[in-house]
Design a protein with these regions (language model features):
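Helix-breaking motifs and short loop linkers at transmembrane-helix boundaries and internal kinks
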Residues: 49, 81, 102-108, 247, ...
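Helix-to-loop junctions at the C-terminal end of transmembrane segments
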Residues: 69-81, 267-279, 363
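Paired small-residue
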Residues: 96, 107-115, 305-313
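Cytoplasmic helix-loop-helix junction between adjacent transmembrane helices
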Residues: 112-150
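Conserved MFS/SLC helix-loop-helix module at the cytosolic interface between two early adjacent transmembrane helices
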Residues: 68-104
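Helix-loop-helix hairpin linking two adjacent transmembrane segments in secondary transporters
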Residues: 108, 137-138, 145-191
Length: 399
């Protein structure tokens, strides 16, 4: 079996597309596992004898462990074969499903959720670095878009599938159904991924935070964090907006949410072409367009057809954007993509938490219009910083 060292250029190697698609299946199971409790919260809480609020903390603990893992995994893993590390994360994912499915108490359930958090943080932090080593440089954005396609597909089907399985075979059966898919992802990665050596000199003693010394990295990560803050300041509260402002029915709500998911999946299929044609222009345009959508929703929130159309456009743009930011990591830090990926995971998770919290505070105190306005303002700031980032990259290329 072939072995790729840390700096292997895929211009001299053939592409491992089987490995890309195997990892995409793993992404699908990861995201489905992460958000499965959302649609199963009521029966899960009743069975474990806890409140729905406590059961919901299973999502919080997975997010917290994802942040910690993403920040320190590269340093802890040292020169470990990255194929073995990815396979280990996949085993943790399968083990998490088993532990949750057979959990007899709340503590065991939370242990299973902690394991899925470690798998999420580890897997995503290595995604850009792995894509760089599996495909030629000009195909990295496409590979990352395929990863994100697995994310988008899981986002579309996880909640309704979890709800259906929970109603037919119970919440334990729903989690158990993820285990054979995780095993299939493990086997596919085992046969399709090459051996990938880690850094022989290990990670810097300063860890991933040393990257903040580079202005382009600092500005880029702040711009990325503002984008996700602006996105989730609005999107977290789209359901109460649709129910109380647009006054959609239960079936209408499901259809609009499904349309958002489908549009997002389509966006991941198209974004590679746009990024390859105009990379930074695309990263600037996405938050600008989303800010415009936020403003348009304030003006037309009572018109169900316009809201449905704008929501679909929002889903297409918001779901496509992560592909661009992961590609930015691959372009900016090709020799340090693991550390950059770790920072990116932490930044995104924290930005989502901050955005949803700030949006909720404004929603409760000032109303939905102020929440949507806040989202638009933050997204405009993200676009401005991304423009600054493009100038920094341009000036650096002339030096």
């Amino acid at each position: 079996m072939s072995t790729l060292n840390h700096t292997t250029s895929q211009h001299e190697e053939h592409a491992y597309w089987g490995g890309i698609f195997a990892m995409t299946l793993c992404v699908f199971v990861l995201i489905a596992s992460e958000f499965m409790p959302v649609s199963l919260l009521t029966p899960l809480a009743a069975d474990l004898g806890v409140t729905e609020g406590l059961a919901g903390q299973g999502i919080a603990i997975s997010g917290a462990l994802a942040v910690l893992t993403s920040l320190f995994l590269s340093r802890l893993a040292g020169n470990m074969n990255r194929k073995h590390l990815l396979l280990g994360m996949t085993i943790l994912m399968a083990l998490s499903g088993l532990i949750i499915a057979f959990a007899q108490n709340y503590q065991t359930y939370m242990t299973g959720r902690a394991l899925i958090g470690i798998a999420i943080g580890g897997f995503w932090s290595m995604s850009a670095a792995t894509a760089i080593r599996l495909v030629p440089h000009h195909q990295v954005t496409r590979a990352l878009a395929i990863f994100n396609g697995g994310n988008a597909l899981a986002t579309v089907v996880a909640a309704p599938l979890g709800s259906y399985l929970g109603a037919t075979i119970g919440w334990r059966g729903a989690f158990l159904c993820l285990v054979p898919v995780a095993i299939a992802a493990f086997l596919w990665q085992y046969v399709s991924l090459p051996n990938m050596s880690g850094r022989k000199n290990g990670a810097s003693g300063e860890g991933v935070f040393r990257l903040f010394r580079q202005p382009v990295v600092s500005v880029g990560l702040i711009a990325c964090s503002l984008f996700f803050m602006g996105q989730f300041a609005l999107f977290t509260y789209v359901r109460p907006f649709l129910e109380t402002v647009t006054h959609v029915s239960a079936s209408g709500l499901s259809l609009i949410l499904l349309a958002i998911g489908i549009a997002g999946f389509v966006g991941t299929l198209l974004v590679t072409l746009v990024l390859n044609a105009a990379f930074y222009l695309t990263l600037i345009a996405i938050p600008l367009l989303m800010a415009a959508i936020a403003g348009a929703l304030i003006l037309t929130g009572h018109n169900v057809w316009i809201v449905a159309l704008l929501s679909g456009l929002w889903g297409m743009l918001a779901t496509a954007a992560p592909t661009g930011w992961w590609a930015w990591v691959a372009r900016t830090l090709p020799e340090d993509a693991e550390a950059g990926g770790g920072l990116m995971v932490a930044v995104i998770q924290l930005a989502i938490a901050l955005g949803s919290t700030a949006g909720g505070m404004v929603f409760n105190r000032l109303g939905w219009q102020s929440t949507f306005a806040l989202s638009g303002i933050v997204l405009l700031c993200a676009a401005a910083l991304t423009f600054m980032l493009s100038r920094l990259r341009e000036s650096a290329s002339w030096k």
